[in-house]
Regions:
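Bulky hydrophobic segments
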Residues: 2-112, 118-145
Length: 145
């Protein structure tokens, strides 16, 4: 099997297993490079931008965990560490760097955005771990009855 064929197969497999995760990640990339947003009443909320970052990344990582837990019977902690925690944080950093350097000043990269993103990812991981424990507890409880 050639590398190109393997890559396409892997992508198709991931798309089938994690469609909502891929949709969330794609949406983050799109929203990160939209040159402007219309004004809303929420603009007056203090730190609304940071809350938005936290919710986007926390929600995305929660979705990654939920889709993972639906497809797997056991946790691969190493895989989850890399793909459901580290990769989104690295992606966030890359996006912030690209916003600062490649958007003709229509967007800016900010350290506090990166911090909000990383906090969201970490909260998403905590939610995922809690869901994993609930899944194991329910499985164990059903086995006892």
């Amino acid at each position: 099997m050639s590398n190109n064929h393997f890559s396409l197969f892997t992508f198709r497999s991931s798309l089938k297993k994690y469609p909502f995760s891929i949709a969330c990640i794609t949406l983050i990339w799109i929203l990160s490079f939209v040159p402007f947003f219309p004004e809303t009443p929420l603009d007056d909320v203090q730190f609304i931008d940071k809350w938005t970052h936290l919710v986007m990344y926390g929600g995305t990582c929660s979705v990654i965990w939920i889709e993972y837990l639906r497809r797997h019977t056991s946790l691969n902690k190493k895989k989850l560490f890399y793909w459901a925690w580290l990769a989104p944080i690295i992606m966030s950093g890359i996006i912030e760097i690209l916003q600062e350097n490649c958007t003709n000043h229509t967007r800016s990269g900010e350290w506090f955005d990166f911090l909000a993103n990383s906090t969201g990812v970490t909260l998403g991981a905590v939610i995922g771990l809690l869901l994993a424990h609930v899944k194991v507890f329910n499985k164990h409880f059903r086995h006892l009855s």
